[in-house]
């Protein structure tokens, strides 16, 4: 067992992401777009399965609560309510649990973020399709080769990790960078001393 080797792989993924100019520009574009969306009184919706669902919930609480410094709460929804998920899964099928949430909460001009470490989650694919049909800006946090979701979103981050845990770790870093970017744009006074 070589745990250090495993973490070296993770750091190599992280290093590649950080050094990739296109990825940095894409992250900045998403942060700017989301700041504009919030400024217009719109919101962000996000979803994922398993650990990615936890990442989605972590992302929204940083907006509805706070990230680093005091500021007003920002409108963010994770499609993760257990009663919604079990109702839709029972009545329509598991592949509709997120798209029905997008249908209910999404409005034209909002942002939707779908997280899938494989890029092949049927329920995330359907949610992206629903978001696009309703005029939401779409962002995909994907893994491996991007799977079926590759090319479906307005903005994409494809992390070519071999295991879901390593992909999720980079996804969470991307989400934190987006949050910080939004705060720096909307609340520059909070970052004056840096």
UniProtKB/Swiss-Prot annotation:
Q: Which InterPro entries match?
A: GmhA/DiaA (IPR035461), Phosphoheptose_Isoase (IPR004515), SIS_dom (IPR001347), SIS_dom_sf (IPR046348), SIS_GmhA/DiaA_subfam (IPR050099)
Q: Which reaction is recorded as catalysed by this protein?
A: 2 D-sedoheptulose 7-phosphate = D-glycero-alpha-D-manno-heptose 7-phosphate + D-glycero-beta-D-manno-heptose 7-phosphate
**A Pfam short name:** SIS_2
Q: Where are the transmembrane segments?
A: none
CDD domains, sorted: SIS_GmhA
Q: Which gene encodes it?
A: gmhA
Q: How is the cofactor bound?
A: Binds 1 zinc ion per subunit.
**Domain SIS, chain residue ranges per copy:** 34-188
MF GO annotations? carbohydrate derivative binding; D-sedoheptulose 7-phosphate isomerase activity; zinc ion binding
This chain's protein is named Phosphoheptose isomerase
**Which cofactors does this protein require?**
Zn(2+)
Point out the signal peptide segment: none
State where substrate binds.
49-51, 62, 90-91, 116-118, 121, 168
**Protein's job:** Catalyzes the isomerization of sedoheptulose 7-phosphate in D-glycero-D-manno-heptose 7-phosphate.
Q: Which GO terms describe its cellular component?
A: cytosol
Q: What is the species of this protein?
A: Fusobacterium nucleatum subsp. nucleatum (strain ATCC 25586 / DSM 15643 / BCRC 10681 / CIP 101130 / JCM 8532 / KCTC 2640 / LMG 13131 / VPI 4355)
Give the enzyme's EC designation: 5.3.1.28
**Which Gene3D superfamilies does the record match to this protein?**
Glucose-6-phosphate isomerase like protein, domain 1
């Amino acid at each position: 067992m070589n745990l250090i080797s495993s973490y070296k792989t993770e750091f190599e993924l992280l290093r590649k992401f950080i050094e990739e100019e296109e990825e940095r520009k894409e992250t900045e574009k998403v942060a700017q777009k989301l700041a504009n969306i919030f400024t217009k009184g719109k919101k962000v919706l996000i979803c994922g399965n398993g650990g990615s669902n936890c990442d989605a919930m972590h992302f929204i609480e940083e907006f509805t609560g706070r990230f680093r410094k005091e500021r007003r709460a920002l409108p963010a929804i994770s499609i993760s309510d257990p009663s919604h998920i079990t109702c839709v899964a029972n009545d329509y099928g598991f592949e509709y649990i997120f798209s029905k949430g997008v249908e209910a909460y999404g409005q034209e001009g909002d942002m939707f973020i779908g997280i899938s470490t494989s890029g092949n989650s049927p329920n995330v694919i359907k949610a992206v399709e629903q978001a696009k049909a309703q005029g939401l800006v779409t962002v995909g946090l994907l893994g491996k080769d991007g799977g079926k979701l590759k090319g479906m979103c307005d903005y994409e981050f494809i992390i070519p990790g071999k295991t879901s845990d390593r992909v999720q770790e980079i996804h969470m870093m991307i989400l934190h960078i987006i949050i910080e970017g939004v705060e720096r744009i909307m609340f520059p006074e909070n970052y004056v001393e840096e």
